Amino acid sequence: MFNLRYLFRLVQEFFLRFKLILLVGLIIGVASFFLIRFVAPLLFSGKLEKIGVTGNFHTDNLPTSILGLIVDGLTKVDEAGNVAPALARSWESPDKGKTWIFHLKDGLFWQDGKKVTSKSIVYEFSDVNIERPNDSTLIFKLQNPFSPFPYIVSRPTFKKGLLGTGKWRVSKISLAGSFVQSIVLTEKEGNKKIIRFYPTEERTKIAFKLGEVNAIQDLFNLQPFETWKVAEVKKEISKGRVVTIFFNTQDKFLSEKNLRQALSYAVDKSKFNSEKALSSISPNSWSYNPQVKPYDYDPAKAKKLIEDLPKESKQDLKIKLVTSPVLLSVAESIAKDWEALGIKVIVQVYSGIPSEYQAFLAIYDIPGDP
């Protein structure tokens, strides 16, 4: 009993005498734990980007902006729309486009460290025979001549396991059914990109507001972020896509060319605060023609064209304009311009591509040069 009492007093005296040192040690220990657990990864594990992308994608049709980080094709298409070497250093056709021979670059490796050979490159085309006479040559034999074939093989090619040849490697991919929900990319320096996909632009914006992502790629409607002091907005005009109206020329009203022209002249395109597109061909393309009819805003000419329509074409004239949620404000502005001509316009929001329509306002991804 005496020994226990003595030991208790000894411990008590020890804590009383060294309580300040013990308290400081406890604080340092707790602070060190949190520093190692939460702060150190941010300081030493490389840069982390969390990017939001709008759209539903499968693993075989991811956006080219993402694929370009991971993998290459035999060729690539530059900003001017020209086909340039990628995995292949050169190519030729000995028979005017029916047979294409591609020669691979030396010193290329997949992300698993294995050498890129003709046998490890996989393309699947119907009605095309592929021969691999050696490790550095692929021969594509088509049934008919096709001069744009080098553009076709700019499509990236993965090795099994989503292994590519690019700087970034797929370390994790999450699926929701058959759609990609998120994809994690890493590089040798330790940097990481987490790319999350959302079905609508509004859902992508909500993810940004909640902190699920710290950047959004290819945002069409910048509101409300243009007025946010904590958000940096970088405006870029995409030369690879265009906002356009598709007219159904089989429709009883829109089969009239003069009506379609009147609707084009009636839209005040200056309200949209963007660069006007003259056609569905990119200005960077060699085949772009700046001399096409511009259809500048001309309400007087639009009214004259409407007046000159046959009587039966003006009777009960009504147009349904179908669009997606992200383009609703644009569609409503266009509808007001058309209504100024005396046309009844109904705006309908549709989340996909409608099977039937009179006029369809959509974002069109411009394909590469043929």
Regions found by a protein language model. Give the residues of each.
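Aromatic- and charge-enriched surface segment that lines or borders ligand/interaction sites
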Residues: S90-N129, A207
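Short, well-ordered beta-strand elements
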Residues: S45-D60, T99-F102, I139, W168-S171, ...
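Append "and occasionally in soluble cytosolic enzymes with long acidic Gly/Pro-rich linkers
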Residues: S255-K336, A340-Q348
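Periplasmic binding protein-like
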Residues: E339-P370
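Hydrophobic membrane-insertion alpha-helices, especially the h-region
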Residues: K19-R37
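Extracellular/periplasmic solute-recognition and catalytic clefts
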Residues: S174-I183, I195-Q250, V349, A359, ...
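N-terminal lobe/hinge region of extracytoplasmic solute-binding protein
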Residues: E49-D95, H103
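Gly/Pro-rich hinge or "lid" segments in bacterial periplasmic/extracellular proteins
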Residues: D135, K141-I195, P199-E202
